[in-house]
């Protein structure tokens, strides 16, 4: 028993020493950041900003690897199963908060991941086609109450923030509108702009050009406060649904077991990066705002999102598979 105890103690000491050495030399080789979505989307843009910033501050390449599919869960699973050395990371989006309730099974568990930092949030804006006879969100709710089930709203796929935002409006306002899911924002835009599906929540940066052209009318934004991109558009909460908040968000995760000093370093670098003026300016163009905070805050934030949307998804009977 004594020999076993001494061996166990020696293993622990050796492991701690190795972790300390790794942290001191990290990164000594290129780091891969897996993005669970195709190039060009908001998650990809945010991920590339983080990769570029970390490469500049830490002096090694941070290479983006796009592995799209299943609302980002395929990419997340790659990282969850990677060696916990800090050389395989992922930037996840708010779909990470909905996936556990949306899918009957996932190729990873939350305990397989180590939160490293919160990056940013992005609001959504509820837009309607100009043919909809409503100039305010309150007028829209009155219209929906007068004609339950008559009007439809679009989303880029089931379980996304666009979809769940609509479901939350239905629950909080006691209105009925029909969900029409698509396979991506690019696919749904022609129908939205033509009025075939006349309303939806969508990323504010994506919708702003169409709003400025007069092709779509903004009624409310989904964040708790107004967005600088559309300062005259009230929030949903201001418009009668107090407490309403739906945000896109992005976080940096590593495999569970990544040495704490490496997590601490990544967290510090992310917190410094997201307040740099050049990054804040890029965020502003996306309608995004820096988040930041400790790894513990990141874990609590993700847990709260999963609990909040898990209830909405289960109560609404939404499934992605």
Question: Where are the language model's segments positioned?
Answer:
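N-terminal signal peptide c-region/cleavage motif recognized by signal peptidases
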Residues: 18-20
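A ligand-binding cleft/hinge motif common to bilobed small-molecule-binding domains
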Residues: 95-103, 163, 170-172, 199-233
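N-terminal (or domain-start) structured segment
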Residues: 23-112, 150-152, 174-203, 210, ...
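Hinge/capping helix and adjacent helix->loop/strand transition within the periplasmic-binding protein
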Residues: 81-87, 101-187, 236-238, 249-282
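Extracytoplasmic/secreted proteins, especially bacterial periplasmic and envelope-associated proteins
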Residues: 45, 49, 53, 74, ...
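An extracytoplasmic/periplasmic, membrane-proximal ligand-sensing/linker region
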Residues: 28-30, 172-175, 212, 235, ...
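Bacterial N-terminal signal peptides that target proteins for export
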Residues: 1-12
